């Protein structure tokens, strides 16, 4: 049996929330896609969307029978990170804990490398 290192963690809390959000949809192929774009106050920002397509080179991580998809360009900035879901006084949201970010903005949605 080989020991394959997964480059990104998809937490149980995030998987549970994705599962609850897609249960009402009429598309069992939906997955959460996390991606990085230029912008935000720190240079890069995280984006989340639901997608039923897996493109060539995409990484798919399964947890609780739901998938997280990351394109190769975004993955290089996310290696070693964690995609989580939090609920608190400031609201609920998907968050990325990224060890590659040298700084993040106050809201946590943008970062710099």
Swiss-Prot record:
Gene behind this protein: erpA
Residues the record lists as binding iron-sulfur cluster: 41, 105, 107
PROSITE patterns for this protein: HESB
Annotated keywords: Iron, Iron-sulfur, Metal-binding
GO molecular function annotations of the record: 2 iron, 2 sulfur cluster binding; 4 iron, 4 sulfur cluster binding; iron ion binding
Domain of life: Bacteria
Family label: Belongs to the HesB/IscA family.
GO annotation (BP), single: iron-sulfur cluster assembly
UniProt entry tagged with the keyword Zinc: no
GO cellular component, as recorded: cytosol
Cofactor(s) this protein requires: iron-sulfur cluster
Pfam families for this protein: Fe-S_biosyn
Lineage start: Bacteria, Pseudomonadati, Pseudomonadota, Gammaproteobacteria, Pasteurellales
Cofactor stoichiometry and binding remark: Binds 1 iron-sulfur cluster per subunit.
Family matches, as InterPro entries: FeS_biogenesis, FeS_cluster_insertion, FeS_cluster_insertion_CS, FeS_cluster_insertion_RrpA, HesB-like_dom_sf
Protein name: Iron-sulfur cluster insertion protein ErpA
Listed HAMAP family: Fe_S_insert_ErpA
Subunit text: Homodimer.
Function: Required for insertion of 4Fe-4S clusters for at least IspG.
Bilayer-spanning residue ranges: none
